[in-house]
Amino acid sequence: MNIHIEDQLVDNLKIIWEETTQYSGLKVVDVSPKLRVIQDFLTTQFWPSLVRFIASGVLNRHGRIKEYSGFMFPEDLDPGDDPFEGVMIFDPLDTIYLSDTVFDRLMNRYFQKLIEGATKYEKDVLKEDWWIEFLDIAKEIEQRVNG
């Protein structure tokens, strides 16, 4: 399935921090089937690794692919690849397309909720070397979103 997703659907996604004995981290919840790819990509118990991997790609518009899932920008295409507009998010089962602006808004909300949760629950990542750089990246993305 290759579909263009309306901005409003993405803007209405609910991103929460869950803190239980079974899970600690961000979740994308109450998702329509059209947005399953986003939910599966962003909801992981290994969120520190995911964030380290994708944050600079979001900021610099460089695609990130891990285990056949990820996101790409038109600038990532090789000669002869089928062109597209916006941002492609994909996994082995589905591919969806978002506008550039809604992708930035989504990732800004995701990163801001992550910073809020990690700070509130005093997660170990706050002491990691990469965390300060991530905060700078998140701030730049927030500034891009807010103009």
Can you annotate each of these PLM segments?
Residues 13, 43, 80, 126-127:
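Acidic, low-complexity intrinsically disordered regions
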Residues 67-125:
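Amphipathic protein-protein interaction modules
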Residues 2-68:
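Negatively charged, low-complexity tracts enriched in Asp/Glu with abundant Ser/Thr
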Residues 16, 40-41, 53, 106, ...:
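Residues that form generic nucleotide/phosphate-binding pockets
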